[in-house]
UniProtKB/Swiss-Prot annotation:
GO terms for cellular component: COPI vesicle coat; cytosol; Golgi apparatus; Golgi membrane. It comes from Rattus norvegicus. Transmembrane segments: none annotated. CDD domains: Coatomer_WDAD_beta-like, WD40. It is a peripheral membrane protein. Pfam families: B-prop_COPA_B_2nd (PF04053), TPR_COPA_B (PF23953), WD40 (PF00400). Residues 867-891 form a coiled coil. The gene is Copb2. This is Coatomer subunit beta'. The keyword Transmembrane helix does not apply. PANTHER family: COATOMER, COATOMER SUBUNIT BETA. Oligomeric complex that consists of at least the alpha, beta, beta', gamma, delta, epsilon and zeta subunits. Probably interacts with PEX11A. Interacts with JAGN1. Interacts with SCYL1.
Length: 905
């Protein structure tokens, strides 16, 4: 079976001919040197050109990143080496390195060295710490030296490829080569070392259209993959995947298996000749340079081959080497969230295939390794081979002794105790299979679930899943697609009933087999169930869990991580990254158990679990209860005063809210509680809350609405004392305390307003106020001050002033005449009264008003809200006079029925 290798193009950068490419080790950058003399830096994540260096007018055949110095080093046909700072774009250094075209640059991984090769047949070593002095010259080739590469397993050794048809291996410090490899019939263009520890191999490509694999210890050619139709211009071992990548002037890039040397894939992007290739350890990205530009492709899946059993034993594959680590061995080591765990790694041996996935069975006794179209089942303890076979895919059942394989796109086989139990062909083929309580088979038509026992169709769903995750109980299942995930409930009782009665069974299976609980628009990368809580990592690098329709974020991850498992006794969740680093995050099992019990409405169990939840986690649980609609329980559980106060308000719990407000001493809380108290008609509590909140406006509203005169009086004094002058003024005004209103305006410097108030209500004070106003205004504008007229000096400008004095006296003497509220219907409204007329009939001897014989209150000046009077009745003579002067047209007849004959007359 072929190697399963996903290939995705990430970047296409059109440009002039590309002579070399390089990838930055930490930034998402690709460096491309061009035949036109420019060097470009592309961001392959944003697909944008981020930097350009105009090097010279001649081809730049070599360019490399020196990340630890923030440099780009270039070599061109003008024989110059140039060093640029890629942050500032400044040229740091420039020197002539060779007497002919510079073909290649190699950067030493640890020392301050670069190696350069040239058409002058020389290789030179340069030390940038010694002002770029030439430390050594390597002579021996008799033609152009096309490429040099440093041995990743021995940094003092490097190899060179030349058009003299040879490959030479050199040692730093020695000017002559260690040995020479010969075998190509034409010039050798490219060379690379195998970075794995298991094989001492070199690869070379030449103008004879051949690729050769060399054992540099035995100095022999071990393989010659054939297939290119033109000169082979580049060749490399991928540092992570078991593949060889070669590029040719025939326009194709060929991918070969590095163990079997089988051709796995051929890429042709139609960009003419291929000139260069670059890959990077720790990344699946590969950069390719063509005549018409450059391309970055992503090969394979970045998810590591890694698995953890329920006891904390982790197995992973590093290339073909299988290693193990045990979380128990950490003992009582303090673990911090998100920090790499200091695990002791144990080598378990080598795997016969290149592992692409590793997965424990449910009880952890066995582990399956899949790759190269094959699977091998090992014992988890000693890595002993238990079973093997060919398969495109493998899936464990919930029963640890049972599993399924997808033999082809049409055949699925089920095994029990390592023996084939059943083979069947799904109706619409099998593109992928999924394990768990039911066997899931994806086809072009959707997803079908089958019974493991008899392969009977349970339900067909029109959905294209990427992953399927079953809970331990088998009641819940998560189906993750490209854009979202669904939470379904498996109704096993209804399935059993339908299988017995054959009711509700259609061609798509049992209709009531599943109940959809929710759909969430988020992409699941990896996931697992703990009880009824689904924990997952998302496409935006968040670690979340879903329970009861609520998504809780556990952590924001700084890189892509993959879930390994959850250890309840540790209360920790474990994840790994593609570099095989293990990290952990705290997640209390008691919290998950409580939430699971609530979701199942098992409140007796929830009450038993609650005491085991630490206090610092209670508020998280309370938020969950609130979202589930159990606010009363949330109020009991929560330990956060803010949250409890909000819940108390929502539930109308005045006592609890009052206690929390006293503890918090927050004006905002007192205002919120006052609103609730008013809505509950608890006016005394509302008054206290408003006092605590110093909400004078609210107190005024409450006092006036309830008709509490003493409260208005106290409020006026308190508001004035605290500088709340508007409220104080209104409180005095509502009580009819005009003198206090006037003095308040004067004290606060509101003299114009005081003058108008005096003119309207207290004419006896107007002269004093105008004098004060004039004195104050003269400090700013003398002319304006002189233009102010005192009403007592210019009575002609203020008509009715004398009458106003009389009214004022009348008001003062009758102001104390207040009437009971029950007489309100008998009182004439202020807008219908004529105070001047009432004051004319006023006699000082009647200052103390008496009840009139008809029971109506005597006349009194109702200028303020606290003053009342009755409607004034006209005398008989006044009515006679009114009738004499009335015209017929003045009579309103809208509500009177008149005889039409009379109207006609």
């Amino acid at each position: 079976m072929p190697l399963r290798l996903d290939i995705k193009r990430k970047l296409t950068a059109m440009s002039d001919r590309v002579k070399s490419v390089d990838l930055h080790p930490t930034e998402p950058w690709m460096l491309a040197s061009l035949y036109n003399g420019s060097v470009c830096v592309w961001n392959h994540e944003t697909q944008t050109l981020v930097k350009t260096f105009e090097v010279c007018d001649l081809p730049v055949r070599a360019a490399k990143f020196v990340a630890r110095k923030n440099w780009v080093v270039t070599g061109a046909d003008d024989m110059q080496i140039r060093v640029f700072n890629y942050n500032t774009l400044e040229r740091v250094h420039m020197f002539e390195a060779h007497s002919d075209y510079i073909r290649c640059i190699a950067v030493h991984p640890t020392q301050p060295f670069i190696l350069t090769s040239s058409d002058d047949m020389l290789i030179k070593l340069w030390d940038w710490d010694k002002k770029w002095s030439c430390s050594q010259v390597f002579e021996g080739h008799t033609h152009y030296v096309m490429q040099i590469v440093i041995n990743p397993k021995d940094n003092n050794q490097f190899a060179s490829a030349s058009l003299d048809r040879t490959i030479k291996v050199w040692q730093l410090g020695s000017s002559s080569p260690n040995f020479t490899l010969e075998g190509h019939e034409k010039g050798v263009n490219c060379i690379d070392y195998y970075s794995g520890g298991d094989k001492p191999y070199l690869i070379s490509g030449a103008d004879d259209r051949l690729v050769k694999i060399w054992d540099y210890q035995n100095k022999t050619c071990v393989q010659t993959p054939e297939g290119h139709a033109q000169n082979v211009s580049c060749a490399t071992f991928h540092p992570e995947l078991p593949i060889i990548i070669t590029g040719s002037e025939d326009g194709t890039v060929r991918i070969w298996h590095s163990s079997t040397y089988r051709l796995e894939s051929t890429l042709n992007y139609g960009m003419e000749r291929v000139w260069c290739v670059a890959s990077l350890r720790g990344s699946n990205n590969v950069a390719l340079g063509y005549d018409e530009g450059s391309i970055i492709v992503k090969l394979g899946r970045e998810e590591p081959a890694m698995s953890m059993d329920a006891n904390g034993k982790i197995i992973w594959a590093k290339h073909s080497e299988v290693q193990q680590a045990n979380l128990k061995a950490m003992g009582d080591t303090e673990i911090k969230d998100g920090e790499r765990l200091p695990l002791a790694v144990k080598d378990m041996g080598s795997c016969e295939i290149y592992p692409q996935t590793i997965q424990h069975n449910p009880n952890g006794r066995f582990v399956v390794v899949c790759g190269d179209g094959e699977y091998i089942i090992y014992t988890a303890m000693a890595l002993r081979n238990k079973s093997f076979g060919s398969a495109q895919e493998f899936a464990w059942a919930h029963d640890s002794s049972e599993y399924a394989i997808r033999e082809s796109n049409s055949v699925v086989k089920i095994f029990k105790n390592f023996k084939e139990k059943k083979s069947f062909k799904p109706d619409f083929g099998a593109e992928s299979i999924y394990g768990g309580f039911l066997l899931g088979v994806r086809s072009v038509n959707g997803l079908a679930f089958y019974d493991w026992e008899n392969t009977e169709l349970i339900r067909r769903i029109e959905i294209q899943p990427k992953h399927i995750f079953w809970s331990d109980s088998g009641e819940l299942v998560c189906i993750a697609t490209e854009e979202s995930f669904f939470i379904l409930k498996y109704l096993s009782e209804k399935v059993l009933a339908a299988q017995e009665t054959h009711e509700g069974v259609t061609e798509d299976g049992i209709e009531d087999a599943f109940e959809v609980l929710g759909e969430i628009q988020e992409i699941v990368k990896t996931g697992l169930w703990v009880g009824d809580c689904f924990i997952y990592t998302s496409s935006v690098n968040r670690l979340n869990y879903y329970v009861g329709g609520e998504i809780v974020t556990i952590a924001h991850l700084d890189r892509t991580m993959y879930l390994l498992g959850y250890i309840p006794k540790d209360n920790r969740l474990y994840l790994g990254d593609k570099e095989l680093n293990i990290v952990s995050y705290s997640l209390l099992v008691s919290v998950l158990e409580y939430q699971t019990a609530v979701m199942r409405r098992d409140f007796s169990m929830a009450d038993k679990v609650l005491p085991t939840i630490p206090k610092e986690q209670r508020t998280r649980v309370a938020h969950f209860l609130e979202k589930q609609g159990f606010k009363q329980q949330a109020l009991t559980v929560s330990t956060d005063p803010e949250h409890r106060f909000e819940l108390a308000l929502q539930l109308g719990e005045l006592k609890i809210a009052y206690q929390l407000a006293v503890e918090a001493e927050s004006e905002q809380k007192w205002k919120q509680l006052a609103e609730l108290a008013i809505s509950k008609c608890q006016f005394s509590l509302a008054q206290e809350c408003l006092h605590h909140a110093q909400d004078y406006g609210g107190l005024l509203l409450l006092a006036t609405a309830s008709g509490n005169a003493s409260m208005v009086n106290k409020l006026a004094e308190g508001a004035e004392r605290d500088g709340k002058n508007n409220v104080a003024f209104m409180s005095y005004f509502l009580q009819g305390k005009l003198d206090a209103c006037l003095e308040l305006l004067i004290r606060t410097g509101r003299l114009p307003e005081a003058a108008f108030l005096a003119r309207t209500y207290l004419p006896s004070q107007v002269s004093r106020v105008v004098k004060l106003w004039r004195e104050n205004l003269s400090k700013v504008n003398q002319k304006a001050a002189e233009s102010l007229a005192d009403p007592t000096e210019y009575e002609n400008l203020f008509p009715g002033l004398k009458e106003a004095f009389v009214v004022e006296e009348w008001v003062k003497e009758t102001h104390a005449d207040l009437w009971p509220a029950k007489q309100y219907p008998l009182v004439t409204p202020n807008e219908e009264r004529n105070v001047m007329e009432e004051a004319k009939r006023f006699q000082p001897s009647r200052a103390t008003a008496q009840q009139e014989p008809d029971g109506k209150p005597a006349s009194s000046p109702v200028i303020m809200a606290s003053q009342t009077t009755h409607k004034e009745e006209k005398s008989f003579q006044e009515l006679e006079d009114d009738l004499d002067t009335m015209e017929l047209e003045d009579i309103d007849t809208t509500d009177i029925n008149l005889d039409e004959d009379i109207l006609d007359d």
